[in-house]
């Protein structure tokens, strides 16, 4: 355990499971007091929870009030709450599209709008938005998700410019394939999971799939003084997946 975030108060949206839960736990282990904002209650002895619907402005306002009243000024905001759909473009409903945009893009906007005025500027606050490598490159049937995450990356740059003069740093993390409950759900639908796992590993030059704590540790760094001159960036946490150009197997040679 390190104390990089000792005395800091952090908010993590969508922190009941997966990457969000890992970020929350990594920050607690680094000395922060962490408030999880989520629709779903959490069972934890070291995390605090308040009800939050990031798509609803009144809910965000109430969450901000509860956080300040019960815990004090926020130093760190992690906009992690997100959803994904898996629909071909022409089959995707407008309602489905709007819901993805509401959670993934409207949510970070509303959280920043109502939490930034309540931040403790003297403590070098930081905002971390969770994007995705799918906001940079393409995958089939994920048009709403990809568009929303590209929007998160753009929002991050704009927020960094707007909030920099206030002393607030803003960065995004773009995770690749991380071993979460959500991604395991995709694997559960594959007949040969062992073969699928091997193929996934091949996509990563580093030789293994990421863990939620890999993203959590990156978030701790971005929230800490060690990254004090880093802002407006999208940090890819993807094991080198986007660094390699895959060629057909006929080009592979054994040495």
What are these regions (language model features)?
Residues 88-89, 96-101, 200:
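Substrate-binding pocket helix/loop in short-chain dehydrogenase/reductase
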Residues 112, 148, 156:
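Active-site helix of classical SDR
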Residues 172, 194-226, 230, 237-239:
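C-terminal helical subdomain
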